[in-house]
């Protein structure tokens, strides 16, 4: 097989990343510059600040990715870049940089959907992984159950109707005084608590759907804390964290395994920042073993936003001749499968 080298760029939120990926599976470099410490004091990502920080660092990050991979731009076959979904200003920084690079070097430009990128992280982690399989995409801004029919063929089976999982985690963490980002902090605190101490609601839709809703459980936690505060009752934060986390993961677990049953598929690949959550990993692995369903997780560095996953997705798009024109624009609400 001929080696195809993809230079990939990711800037959809608060990570500026560039990577060099071979044939969608082998990572030669994956440079990530995170803005977490900057946004922490604001309690969340400030879009304008994120955009400015991307502008300041992107040139260095791309050059460092080429240097770490020990290749030059001449060695690159195509340039992949995230063009949605995400923050419009942040997306534009990466996209415009990639356009300029592709134009100047006469390399093909490959626009990549950020969600496809998250799913493709599993192709890096598992070198022999091939569709079909089910993917559960869980992150700060996205929650999807996706039927991966082929490398570039996706069917959204379920999605959140309100808050994404990571969004709910951040809001609950803030109410518990844990700060931002909330996911890792709740995961850590929950280990000290009783997941059955408090009964928080699990949203179930009556119609034939595998969609999610996490605004109810988030509101239930906030109401519980407010009532306890008004009555002067001391709250066990670890129990709240553990009970909230169990409520969320129960719903994710039920819907994704029901999808496997409906689609007659015995493989689930988890993706997105929340895929690093230890309780989610343990719960799905345990349930998967009982149901004889294989559960796949990328390593944590591939769960967070990174350019290696974009490079993998770009390679498979390139193989299908999904090459972008230079009038491609950033799409903050880009749907999976939209071209």
From Swiss-Prot:
Gene3D superfamilies: 3.30.420.40. Its cofactor is Fe(2+). One of its GO terms (cellular component) is cytoplasm. The keyword Amino-acid biosynthesis does not apply. Its EC number is 2.3.1.234. GO terms for biological process: tRNA threonylcarbamoyladenosine modification. Binds 1 Fe(2+) ion per subunit. It catalyses: L-threonylcarbamoyladenylate + adenosine(37) in tRNA = N(6)-L-threonylcarbamoyladenosine(37) in tRNA + AMP + H(+). NCBIfam families: gcp_kae1 (TIGR00329), T6A_TsaD_YgjD (TIGR03723). This is tRNA N6-adenosine threonylcarbamoyltransferase. The gene is tsaD.
């Amino acid at each position: 097989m001929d080696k195809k080298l993809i230079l990939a760029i990711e800037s959809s939120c608060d990570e500026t990343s560039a990577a060099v990926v071979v044939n969608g599976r082998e990572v030669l470099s994956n440079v990530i510059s995170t803005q977490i410490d900057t946004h922490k004091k604001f309690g969340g990502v400030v879009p304008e600040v994120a955009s400015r920080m991307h502008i300041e660092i992107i040139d260095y990050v791309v050059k460092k990715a080429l240097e770490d991979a020990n290749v030059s731009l001449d060695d690159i076959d195509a340039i992949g870049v995230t063009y949605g979904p995400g923050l419009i200003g942040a997306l534009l920084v990466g996209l415009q940089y990639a356009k300029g690079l592709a134009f100047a070097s006469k390399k093909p430009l490959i626009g990549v959907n950020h969600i496809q990128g998250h799913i493709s992280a599993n192709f890096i982690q598992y070198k022999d992984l091939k569709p079909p399989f089910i993917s559960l995409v869980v992150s700060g801004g996205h929650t999807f159950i996706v039927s991966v029919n082929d490398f570039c063929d996706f069917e959204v089976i379920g999605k959140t109707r309100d808050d994404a999982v990571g969004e709910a985690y951040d809001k609950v963490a803030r109410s518990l005084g844990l700060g931002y980002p909330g996911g890792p902090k709740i995961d850590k605190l929950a280990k000290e608590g009783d997941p059955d101490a408090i009964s928080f609601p699990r949203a179930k839709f009556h119609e034939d759907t595998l969609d999610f809703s996490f605004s109810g459980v988030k509101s239930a936690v906030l109401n519980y804390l407010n009532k306890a505060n008004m009555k002067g009752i001391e709250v066990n934060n670890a129990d709240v964290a553990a009970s909230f986390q169990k409520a969320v993961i129960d719903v994710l677990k039920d819907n994704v395994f029901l999808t496997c049953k409906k689609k007659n598929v015995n493989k689930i690949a988890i993706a997105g920042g929340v895929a690093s959550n230890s309780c989610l990993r343990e719960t799905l692995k345990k349930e998967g073993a009982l149901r004889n369903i294989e559960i796949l997780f990328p390593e944590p560095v591939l769960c967070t936003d990174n350019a290696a996953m974009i490079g993998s997705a770009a390679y498979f798009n390139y193989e299908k001749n999904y090459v972008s024109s230079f009038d491609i624009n950033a799409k903050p609400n880009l749907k999976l499968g939209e071209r």
